[in-house]
């Protein structure tokens, strides 16, 4: 397994983390996370055609819940894919805290914040290995 830089972001007001990484093999990060229910390692199957992926996870080291957002390459980090994956992550966070995305403003602010996290990784402003 190759070492992949995981960029961790903390929304502070929510008990949930966002991890963003760029790797051409999503399984490179599987050893660092458990499935959301904590019952086993995450596994990525049939990801050859995926350009990006988001899933709810639990971090193995500190048992923090969050969403991992993975991109195959910087080329795949276009505005469409960033928005798409940020939307998945925002929905997962709202599901985790029992909030309704129909309460528009909090959801939209969160979506924008997650997109900004991804943009930060794309622009290499933050590289924190977790």
Regions found by a protein language model. Name each.
Residues 77-86:
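Short alpha-helical catalytic segment bearing the HExxH-like zincin motif
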Residues 22-28, 73-78, 97:
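Intrinsic-disorder/low-complexity, polar/charged segments
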Residues 1-49:
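Non-catalytic terminal regions of proteins
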Residues 101-130:
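Post-HExxH zinc-binding segment in Zn-dependent metallohydrolases
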Residues 86-103:
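Catalytic Zn2+-binding segment of zinc metalloproteases
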Residues 34-76, 89-93:
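Active-site scaffold of zinc-dependent metalloenzymes
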